[in-house]
Amino acid sequence: MGRGAIVQASWLAFLAILLAAGAVPAATDFPNKPVNLVIGFAAGGETDIVVRAMNEELGKRLGVPAVVLNKPGSGGLVGAEFVAKSKPDGYNLLVLSLSHVLRQAGDPTMTVNVPKDFEPICRFVTQPIVLVVQGDSQFKTVENLIDFGKQNVNKLNFGSPGVGSVGHFSGELFKAETKATFKHVPFNGSAPSITALMGGHIDFLVTALPALGGKVASGDLRILASFADKRLSEMKDVPTMIEKGFPQARMAGWFGFVAPAGTPKDVLEKLGQAFQGTIKDPKIVETVQKMAFNEAYLSAGELSTHIKSELALFSKIAKEEGIVIK
C-alpha cells in the first residue's frame, strides 16, 4: 500500500471514530429526558411520601420531569438491583436509605454492594431515632432503664419491626454502648411492635420518631432519650444519649440518592447541584419538617464517608450479636 493510500485509510478510520462518538449523546446534553427516582418500596410509604414532596421542584431545576418509580420487593432490594444494573447515564437513580446499609451489614449474600455498585449524589433528609416506653412505665429516665438492664440480665425486652430493621440495630447499638442487657423481640412491622409496647408485652422500643404518630402527644407512649447529635427542636425537654454520657450512641434514619457505578462525573455534578438546590429550598424544608423529617443535606463525598462508616459499625454489631438477615 502506497503512502497516499495509508494516509487516506487513516483519515477514514478517524472519521469513523468521530461518527461513532456522535451517535452517543454527550454527557453535556444531560438531562434530555425524564429522570427516574426509583424507590424500592410500595407507593404510600414514608419513603414514597417524602420523595414525592420534592420531585416536582427537582424536575424544575433539572429542566425535565423527575418521575417517582416504585419497584417494591425483598426489603428494597428489587429497586436497588434495578438501578445497579441500569445504564450509568444518570436517568435511573435509587433512593438509598439506612435500611439498605443495614441489610448489607447483616446479609453477606446480598446481591447489591452499596459502596461498590453506586455513585453517591447526596443525602437529603434524616429521621430522629428515639427510645420510647409505655406512658405509665416504671422507667422515668433512660438512666433508670440502663441501671435496671445492668442489674437484671435479660429481664427487659425491646421490640423492633423485624430482624435487621432500623429498630433492631438501634436497640443493639443501645445495648453495646450502655453495656446493659436486653432481649430482642422481633415483630412483623412497626405497627405490631408499637401495639405490643402499648399493651405492656415489651418494655421499650428504639424507633424512628414518625412511626409513633400521635401516641406520644396522647400520653400512651413516653420518650426517654433521642439518638440525635443535639436536642430535637420539637422535643426540647428530651435529652440525647450523648448528654447522658454515651457519645457513640448516635443514629438517625436517613434517605439519599445514588446513581449506578460508572455514571460520568459531570452528570453526577449536575444532579448534585439540582438536588442541593431542591433540598435547601425553604418550601421543601418546611414540607419535610411537617412529615417529621429534617433537611440534612450531605454532599456526594460526605455521603460516601457516612455510608462506609455506618457499614463498618453495623457489620461489627451484626457479627457480635449474630444478626443474620434472610
What are these regions, as identified by a protein language model?
Residues 9-22:
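Bacterial N-terminal signal peptides
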Residues 1-7:
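N-terminal secretory signal peptides that target proteins for export/translocation
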Residues 58, 85-92, 105-192, 241-243, ...:
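Hinge/capping helix and adjacent helix->loop/strand transition within the periplasmic-binding protein
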Residues 26-117, 155, 163, 179-206, ...:
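N-terminal (or domain-start) structured segment
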Residues 32-34, 176-180, 243, 265-326:
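An extracytoplasmic/periplasmic, membrane-proximal ligand-sensing/linker region
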Residues 99-109, 173-177, 204-238:
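A ligand-binding cleft/hinge motif common to bilobed small-molecule-binding domains
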Residues 95-100, 160, 189-190, 207-212, ...:
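Beta->alpha turn/N-cap motifs
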